[in-house]
């Protein structure tokens, strides 16, 4: 039998209704391109969930899906959900480092994380809703220090792969408090 090709009709339908917590983890930029083509049809549903206060934890390159758009190494621009006013761009290389971060909701606490990325985010001006100040590591782009992540309503977005909740009780407590 011939191998079956999968297409848009085979893609999983997304329904965010009834969920209190949504986690989306990192992936390769080339895979996010395919995800963006599918997820964009659910823009209104993601916006409704965000506005209704659903708690999101979005880590690593999955953050690209929530900005306006992102560009891959081949020069193609992919639309994203548009919840936030940033764009992303894949670069040729890999940034791998540990991080020491301070959450804006508990600046006296330290969050430990690990980053493995080949993308940056770009804002018009400063990040209007950072999740962390950076003690050690990189911001949302190629600069060291500054701020990193997104905390807006109940949306937590970070480059840090963690293990974010297991390794950082302050993050776990804050997310549980918001559920």
Label each region the model flagged.
Residues 18-19, 52-54, 76-79, 108-111, ...:
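Short coil/turn connectors at secondary-structure junctions
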Residues 155-179:
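Acyltransferase
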